[in-house]
């Protein structure tokens, strides 16, 4: 019965989405379908503040990620096109390549080169093809935040914007030695995002990949070192969900989390904290970009109007309005104005410093797993719990968990994603 109700609810939402876009198309306005900024308050800000400065009326229609490809496929199959521009996360746009639904934007993308969108972000927009299929729109990421009280304990000669994991461990160890407290923190609670730390930061930094080198010797050494560093981590980290709370309370002096989950601390006490990139390992400074892009569908009713809207949304002034109002940060190169909120400035600078780092190594969120994403995350969290929290032998755990990982990847058929090398067929741990 639950499945039936879920199917009916999904079908109703999809039908309402079709009706909304059809009515909007009849009005002659541009149709902008987005999986992002869906909450009522966010959507209102999009319509009334961000799109308000555009010269033409735009109907901003939102869709849940699971509805998004269904709607696009329905238009492709019917031959009736109503949508001009789509906005979605990188991983939500990737499946549209198989549908051959996205119009190439090579010439248009070339005209935007002067805006300073980082090369790696534009490369993501090719979706592993030869063509520019989306233009980066807005971004978030994961950053580190430290209480300024921790700064005197930094290792000699350490640059906070270019820390290594060895230096991070030494920093936390010195704080513990001098204060008697374990003040490094991670969001390892039940609803925390600790799995993203492993998938996007630690594994790429030490192994250069995620799935392929999952059980490698480099991974074994990585887990051994991380288990050692955990001795300086606040034990309450296994309950933390949003790191802004322990940062504000002083229970943690150094923390890692998604920018949205530390932003409140930066906004409340911008003079008390510093924000900076995650650390680097032997293979580079692994980081996981949260990137939303703008694309045009093949058969869009107004191709020129669609590109004009994308042009507007990627202008520096529009990007700043977006950052002020919805907390997504610019993808273009722009100077933050003097009156920009201090907490947002700290976060934006940390993201910019991450991307511009000479050793930056982007690791995309998992792609192609469908509804099995949580099972993928569980492999990394189970590995963490067994090795770090329970002290089990790293080699034994990695060999066992690699079997689970390979079985999952085979079942989903998901090919490798960056930074793992491209694969023919399902990605596999070697």
Predicted feature residues:
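Extracytoplasmic "Venus flytrap"/periplasmic binding protein-like
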Residues: 31, 48-117, 152-154, 253-254
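Hinge/lid segment of periplasmic solute-binding proteins
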Residues: 89-143, 169, 274-276
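Short, solvent-exposed loop/beta-turn-alpha elements that line the ligand-binding surface or hinge
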Residues: 106-117, 160-161, 203-222, 228, ...
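Glycine-centered hinge/linker elements that transmit conformational signals in sensory
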Residues: 169-175, 209-240
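Extracytoplasmic/periplasmic solute-binding protein
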Residues: 125, 129-138, 142, 166-211, ...
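Extracytoplasmic/periplasmic substrate-recognition and gating elements
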Residues: 228, 234, 267-331, 364-365
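Long, aromatic- and glycine/proline-rich binding clefts that accommodate carbohydrate-like moieties
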Residues: 324-386, 414-430
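Short, polar/charged alpha-helical segment
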Residues: 37-59, 380, 398
């Amino acid at each position: 019965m639950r499945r039936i109700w879920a199917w009916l609810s999904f079908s109703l939402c999809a039908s309402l989405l079709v009706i909304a876009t059809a009515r909007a198309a009849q009005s002659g306005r541009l149709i902008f379908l987005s999986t992002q900024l869906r909450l009522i308050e966010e959507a209102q800000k999009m319509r009334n503040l961000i799109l308000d400065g555009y010269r033409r009326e735009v109907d901003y229609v939102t869709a849940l990620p699971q509805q998004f490809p269904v709607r696009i496929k329905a238009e492709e199959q019917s031959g009736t096109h109503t949508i001009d521009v789509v906005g979605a996360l990188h991983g939500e746009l990737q499946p549209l390549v198989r549908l051959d639904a996205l119009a190439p934007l090579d010439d248009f993308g070339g005209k935007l080169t002067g805006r300073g969108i980082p090369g790696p972000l534009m490369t993501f927009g090719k979706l592993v093809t030869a063509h520019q299929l989306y233009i980066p729109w807005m971004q978030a990421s994961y950053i580190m935040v430290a209480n300024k009280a921790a700064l005197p304990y930094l290792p000699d000669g350490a640059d906070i914007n270019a820390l290594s994991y060895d230096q991070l461990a030494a920093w936390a160890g010195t704080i513990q030695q001098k204060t008697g407290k374990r003040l490094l923190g991670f969001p390892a609670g039940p609803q925390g995002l600790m799995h993203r730390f492993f998938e996007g930061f630690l594994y790429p930094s030490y192994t250069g990949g995620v799935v392929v080198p999952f059980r490698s010797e480099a991974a074994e050494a990585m887990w051994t070192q991380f288990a050692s560093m955990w001795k300086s981590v606040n034990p309450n980290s296994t309950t933390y969900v949003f790191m802004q709370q322990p940062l504000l309370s002083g229970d943690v002096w150094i923390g890692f989390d998604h920018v949205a989950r530390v932003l409140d601390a930066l906004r409340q006490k911008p003079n008390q904290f510093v924000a900076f990139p995650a650390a680097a390992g032997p293979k580079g400074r692994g980081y996981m970009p949260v990137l939303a892009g703008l694309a045009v569908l093949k058969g869009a009713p107004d191709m020129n109007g669609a590109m004009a809207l994308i042009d507007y949304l990627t202008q520096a002034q529009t990007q700043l309005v977006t950052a002020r109002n919805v907390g997504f940060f610019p993808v273009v190169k722009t100077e933050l104005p003097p009156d920009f909120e201090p907490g947002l400035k700290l976060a934006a600078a940390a993201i910019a410093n991450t991307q511009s780092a000479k050793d930056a190594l982007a690791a995309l969120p998992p792609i192609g797993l469908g509804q099995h994403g949580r099972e993928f995350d569980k492999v990394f969290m189970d590995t963490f719990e067994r090795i770090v929290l329970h002290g089990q032998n790293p080699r034994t755990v990695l060999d066992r968990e690699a079997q689970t990982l390979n079985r999952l990847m085979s079942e989903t058929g998901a090919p490798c994603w960056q930074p793992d090398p491209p694969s023919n067929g399902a990605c596999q741990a070697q």
